């Protein structure tokens, strides 16, 4: 079962800005994990993740890609995992 229907992957961002991104995510009650070239941020609400991405875009230049993956069924509803990939320019 998917606990977090949305993952935001932040990659290739300047090291000094990584801490700012981390603090912004923690303020929105997201789980943050360190990844090889950045951060993986897990959101329980897709709309909250979209608001977070919108705030980030205002403060730094990013290239954004979005993908979806099938995550199973809950009752008769299809669950979808949203993955947003953000890369610094």
From Swiss-Prot:
> InterPro entries from the entry?
Nmd3_N
Name the source's superkingdom: Archaea
What Pfam families does the record tag this protein with?
NMD3 (PF04981)
**Listed name of the protein:** Uncharacterized protein AF_0860
Question: What organism is listed for this UniProt entry?
Answer: Archaeoglobus fulgidus (strain ATCC 49558 / DSM 4304 / JCM 9628 / NBRC 100126 / VC-16)
């Amino acid at each position: 079962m998917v606990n977090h229907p949305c993952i935001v992957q932040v990659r290739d961002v300047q090291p000094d800005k990584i801490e700012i991104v981390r603090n912004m995510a923690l303020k929105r009650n997201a789980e943050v994990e360190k990844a090889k070239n950045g951060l993986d941020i897990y959101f329980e609400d897709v709309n909250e993740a979209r608001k977070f991405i919108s705030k980030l875009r205002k403060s730094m230049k990013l290239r954004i890609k979005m993908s979806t993956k099938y995550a199973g069924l809950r009752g008769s509803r299809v669950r979808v995992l949203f993955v947003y990939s953000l890369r610094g320019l």
